[in-house]
Amino acid sequence: MRRALALAALIALSTAATAGAAYAEHWTKFANGDNGTEWSYDGDYSYKDKQTGRLVVMQAISKPSANLAPGGPGTGVGYVYALDCAKHNVIMVSAYKPSQPFAIPDNWRSNTPKKAGGAEDEALFAAVCPHIDHVPVK
């Protein structure tokens, strides 16, 4: 019970600390996971990488039955992926969770892409790839 209270307090403090940040998060659910989890992507973070043409997307896991909403670095748990919508492959750019600092490695573009597979990957591609021409290029 004390752990649950400590976790709730940590989440509340993290949320309060980032509430004034200029970065807005707009999460859109794209898939159901195992054991009542859900996967969402942040539409405000998505962009097309100028160097590779890949669609870069932040996704987070949530569990509504435990009152855990999707969140970005510092408050949530998730990944940043670079998708090649035409070739249907993906590069994991970074992973994040509250207990570690968020960092995007400079060399992520040189990582070997992996073929997309599984229901969650397919759902992510279906949800975000139609918007590739409507996101900012960075």
At which residue positions do the language-model features occur?
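Bacterial N-terminal signal peptides that target proteins for export
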Residues: M1-A8
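Residues at secondary-structure transition points
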Residues: A9, T15, W39-D42
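Alpha-helix boundary/capping residues
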Residues: I11-A12, I132
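C-terminal segment of classical bacterial N-terminal signal peptides
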Residues: L13-A21
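N-terminal secretory-pathway/extracellular module detecting exported/lumenal segments
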Residues: G20-Y79, D84-K138
